[in-house]
């Protein structure tokens, strides 16, 4: 069983992880474009999640959302590629640590489970969207 955290704690966790990544990238001093690239990836994820087709069955909804989630990670790695090598490694480490937090209803759980029980997790998507929005707001305040 995973931890049951409300949206405020999830937002805090995401914000701390993103702040840690931003701090590491800023320290490198060579990666000015990475901020725009990362924010573009985050905005694209938000747009995709907000505009995914309605009226699909749960299995198709989950597949669609998970495709957006994987696209976000691919986009982020691409944005970090031109930066210092350590930034990409840092992102991969943060992704792994986030997955290990085992927060019930997270996109890691939703998209990685494959156990057929993920349909009950769809209401958690709204919490995750709010969390991502809060993380973006925190990130932009840097």
Curated annotation (Swiss-Prot):
It is found in: Cell membrane; Synapse. Component of the outer core of AMPAR complex. AMPAR complex consists of an inner core made of 4 pore-forming GluA/GRIA proteins (GRIA1, GRIA2, GRIA3 and GRIA4) and 4 major auxiliary subunits arranged in a twofold symmetry. One of the two pairs of distinct binding sites is occupied either by CNIH2, CNIH3 or CACNG2, CACNG3. The other harbors CACNG2, CACNG3, CACNG4, CACNG8 or GSG1L. This inner core of AMPAR complex is complemented by outer core constituents binding directly to the GluA/GRIA proteins at sites distinct from the interaction sites of the inner core constituents. Promotes neurite outgrowth and especially branching of neuritic processes in primary hippocampal and cortical cells. Induction: Induced by neural activity and by the activity-regulated neurotrophins BDNF and NTF3. It comes from the Eukaryota. Belongs to the neuritin family. It comes from Rattus norvegicus (Rat). The keyword Lipoprotein applies. GO terms for cellular component: AMPA glutamate receptor complex; extracellular space; glutamatergic synapse; plasma membrane; postsynaptic endocytic zone; presynapse; side of membrane. This is Neuritin. A lipid is attached at residue 116 (GPI-anchor amidated glycine). GO terms for biological process: nervous system development; neuron projection extension; presynaptic modulation of chemical synaptic transmission; regulation of synapse maturation.
């Amino acid at each position: 069983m995973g931890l049951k955290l409300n949206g405020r704690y999830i937002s805090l966790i995401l914000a701390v992880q993103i702040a840690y990544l931003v701090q590491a990238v800023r320290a490198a001093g060579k990666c000015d474009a990475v901020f725009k690239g990362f924010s573009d990836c985050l905005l694209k994820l938000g747009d995709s999640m907000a505009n995914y087709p309605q009226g699909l069955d749960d299995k198709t909804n989950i597949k669609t959302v998970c495709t957006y989630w994987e696209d976000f990670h691919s986009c982020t790695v691409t944005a970090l590629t031109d930066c210092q090598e350590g930034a990409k490694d840092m992102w991969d480490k943060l992704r792994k640590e986030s997955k290990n937090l085992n927060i019930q209803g997270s996109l890691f759980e939703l998209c990685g489970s494959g156990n057929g029980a993920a349909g009950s997790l769809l209401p958690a998507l709204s919490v995750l969207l709010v969390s991502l929005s809060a993380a973006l707001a925190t990130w932009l305040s840097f």
